[in-house]
Amino acid sequence: MAEVSSSTVRRPFHRRRKTCPFSGANAPKIDYKDVRLLQRYISERGKIVPSRITAVSQKKQRELAKAIKRARFLGLLPYVVA
């Protein structure tokens, strides 16, 4: 059998998990009227960016999605960007 030397074995790279931008003392409140904040979590095509990319917690992602949908309904944000 072939022996694997320790110099050729690569250890997997572990990326440090980013913290949620909406948790903490100075965190912004999620509000459907704050269009500038909501636009940071919408893609160029108008889709809601998933939490695995933005590092938003599951609870705050639900709040964010609800606020974006409410702002779209009221005409503050577009549904689709052509």
UniProtKB/Swiss-Prot annotation:
The keyword Membrane does not apply. GO terms for cellular component: cytosolic small ribosomal subunit. GO terms for molecular function: small ribosomal subunit rRNA binding; structural constituent of ribosome. Residues 1-20 are annotated as: Disordered. GO terms for biological process: translation. It comes from the Bacteria. SUPFAM superfamilies: Ribosomal protein S18. InterPro entries: Ribosomal_bS18, Ribosomal_bS18_CS, Ribosomal_bS18_sf. Keywords: Ribonucleoprotein, Ribosomal protein, RNA-binding, rRNA-binding. NCBIfam families: S18 (TIGR00165). Part of the 30S ribosomal subunit. Forms a tight heterodimer with protein bS6. Belongs to the bacterial ribosomal protein bS18 family. Binds as a heterodimer with protein bS6 to the central domain of the 16S rRNA, where it helps stabilize the platform of the 30S subunit. This is Small ribosomal subunit protein bS18. It comes from Allorhizobium ampelinum (strain ATCC BAA-846 / DSM 112012 / S4) (Agrobacterium vitis (strain S4)). The gene is rpsR.
